[in-house]
Amino acid sequence: MNKGWLELESDPGLFTLLVEDFGVKGVQVEEIYDLQSKCPGPVYGFIFLFKWIEERRSRRKVSTLLDDTSVMEDEVVNNMFFAHQLIPNSCATHALLSVLLNCGGVHLGPTLSRIKEFTKGFSPESKGYAIGNAPELAKAHNSHARPEPRHLPEKQNGISAVRTMEAFHFVSYVPIKGRLFELDGLKVYPIDHGPWAEDEEWTDKARRVIMERIGLATAGEPYHDIRFNLMAVVPDRRLKYEGKLNILKMNRQTVLEALQQLIRVTQPELIQAQKSTDGQSTEETKSPAIKAPVSQESHRAHHGSHRSTTDLGAEPAGSLLRGPVLSAHNKSKPLPQNGGIVPAPASRLPAFLDNHNYAKSPMQEEEDLAAGVGRSRGVPPPAPDTDEEEEEETENVRRPLTPPGFKRRSSESLPPPPGPEPGVLAEKLKETQRDLCSPLSIKTGAPTAPHSQPSPTPSNESTDTASEIGSAFNSPLRSPLRSANPTRPSSPVTSHLSKVLFGEEEPLSRLDCVRYNRAVRELGPHISTGILHLSKDGYLSPLSRLDTGKVSPKSHKAEEPRESPEPDSERNRVTEAPQGEKFSPKELLALLKCVEAEISASEACLREELEKRKKFKIDDQRRTHNYDEFICAFISMLAQEGMLASLVEQNISVRRRQGVSIGRLHKQRKPDRRKRSRPYKAKRQ
């Protein structure tokens, strides 16, 4: 029982893989580098490594030293999972079990659930024997340890093997029933550090206790000693980012539906035009003379969809009219009622939505492009009614080479611009629904999208290890309200839309757009934590859960375009808007940009977590691999080539020149610095 347990290193990747081998799901281990910074997010417990003062850490005898903070009540001690360490080198597993088996809401798996149920009410000594009699724990423990040497070196005279080895020990800090406990398997009783204040978290008190302990051990110099290490047991961040991505994608679909509904409300005359063009498309597609130009134009549009938005904007308007004329048969049809997908060989989108994909992430767009899914382009029929914004849109489309600073704002005599149609976002919504139904997949080997945020830590995939990546506690995510920062690359979809609709890209990319944009200010904090709801009347509202479990929406309505109200400098927190408040298209586009920025940031964080798991496994394989066979084969090859003897002789001669004795270590004789009595001189000259 007490033989065969190996020492484990203090590495967060090792402990994360050990937790998975125990059968626990949804838990990982992170390393803490700064004790003065607050730990974001929930923390199940801390694992603290320090240098053990006694001669042997893995001794059978448990320390009997007691102090005022020791909890000696059997009822309290037996109701928590506190086990004596009766097995050498098992302190890492003891510390990890002390955290996992004392916190609720964790999927322990069959092995730990059976141990927790079996040892309920046992004494600490009995729980220690239960850990030693669990072969699953011993197997998982030793699978992540370095292999021990087969032949131990001979004991050298005059040197104590115990005193020369530095022993380290793991302990746990866990919150139990409102009090902070320190669980040390080499002590008889757990240590109670008391409750924490009402205005702080338990992690704040634990950090203070650990800092005081480090300060006492290092004579007041806590940051000049590397004999300590602190790790935190936290929820799995992969599950966190996956859930956040699902919520963001559903909210993106809701915003797109709000835009589509806004088009139907503001321009109802286009509904009849859409129906008439749909009827013409069914008749024209029957003739084979029209099918060939349509297929050629679709093929040409598919190859042209790979170009950037700058190239599309710089293309003259006359070039769009070359080739076969596509009148009305290549318009996108509205979304069918049964949820099916209507095949559109040459889908038509308006100018401000052309060649963009709302419903897919950058990595999924690459997959679609590789599969041959393309977008066709064409010129829509002009709408009879125009306003100032539509004239700006027409000017941007027909004069793409004009610099943004010299664009005309006044209304001029221009041809009627193409107006948005009711089926503008139908195809985008269908693709969004397919995206929501498909399982979430992140390609870790794919190149990073231009508008996705890279990892702040530079890394080389071939050489960096997981321990060099850093901790997630030191790199907090941006809040939704900060996603409009110009340092973050904007989405090509919303930037092109804002450039076409409003004449310039700057308003939606400036930092102060958060002040005057009501949609981002009021719905921005909810896009990654809650689901947005769109009613039939056009009210866009976040769903807030009440104590009864019901969901109540806070209504904000998307209505016809109008200027946003003046910013309120004193309004720093999200408040409930009055009933019937309306959002303009500019505000909805800004909200859409905020959602897309959060999706890009979450995908980058999820990709980074997956890369960390890969490097954890690489480090573990390097650590546990047995290199003895390779070394023996290499030495035998040197002996066969006749090079071994010369190398050994050369190495010995180098050591002799450096003054290092080859044989038995001799105790160096120190010079005698004692004061010697001088002979008394009787006579003085």
From Swiss-Prot:
EC category name: hydrolase
- SUPFAM superfamilies of this UniProt entry? Cysteine proteinases (SSF54001)
Start-end of Polar residues biased regions? 273-282, 450-496
Please give the residue ranges the record annotates as the region Disordered: 272-347, 363-425, 440-496, 543-580, 659-685
Q: Which residues form the ULD domain?
A: 626-654
EC number assigned by the record: 3.4.19.12
Protein keywords: Chromatin regulator, Cytoplasm, Hydrolase, Nucleus, Protease, Thiol protease, Ubl conjugation pathway
Give the protein name, as stated in the record: Ubiquitin carboxyl-terminal hydrolase BAP1
Q: How does it assemble?
A: Component of the PR-DUB complex.
Q: Which residues form the UCH catalytic domain?
A: 4-235
Site positions (Transition state stabilizer) are 85
Cellular compartments annotated: Cytoplasm; Nucleus
Keyword Protease among record annotations: yes
Its source organism is Xenopus laevis
Molecular functions per Gene Ontology: chromatin binding; cysteine-type deubiquitinase activity
Q: What GO biological process terms are annotated to this protein in UniProt?
A: heterochromatin formation; negative regulation of DNA-templated transcription; protein deubiquitination; protein K48-linked deubiquitination; regulation of cell cycle; regulation of cell growth; ubiquitin-dependent protein catabolic process
Catalysed reaction equations from the record: Thiol-dependent hydrolysis of ester, thioester, amide, peptide and isopeptide bonds formed by the C-terminal Gly of ubiquitin (a 76-residue protein attached to proteins as an intracellular targeting signal)
